[in-house]
Amino acid sequence: VTASEEFITNTLGNEGYAFAEVSGVPEILEDEQAVNLTFFVEPGQRTYVRRIEFIGNERTYDVVLRREMRQMEGAWASNALIENSKLRLERLGFFKQVEVETKPVPGISDQVDIEYTVEEEFSGSIGGSIGYGAWGLTLGANYSENNAFGTGNRLVVGINKNAWQTSY
């Protein structure tokens, strides 16, 4: 019963009915050894997204996060699109954790705000190398950053030096 209620609620949520209420009432028929299930569905009003907000992105620009959104502001709220947007943020690799919360707008019954809370993590790496060969001692260093300057672009810088050449 609970799984069926959740399925109906999620299906309605994908169609913009974010606050749908579904309750299943079983009726046991002992003579027939069966159970009748009656579902009472109150979809409520279709709900639209007023605003999408990001919290915790101190380094990454909002535009980088917004381009991953599949749920759009002004469109009706879809549970599937909200979760898909969360998954896309997680796959960027810039965050330790991504949480999403859908909040009703006070005083407006058919609108919600969606709040994504992210916890940024270091997305770069530093490396070095040392070697010896026909040209003598070779030294190398490199730095790579997957979210350069918060733009979501990748930056790689490296240098190798020995007695005969220097390469960047």
Annotate the PLM regions:
Residues 1-137, 142, 156-167:
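Periplasmic polypeptide-binding modules associated with outer-membrane biogenesis and secretion
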Residues 148-154:
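Short loop/turn motifs that connect adjacent beta-strands in outer-membrane beta-barrel proteins
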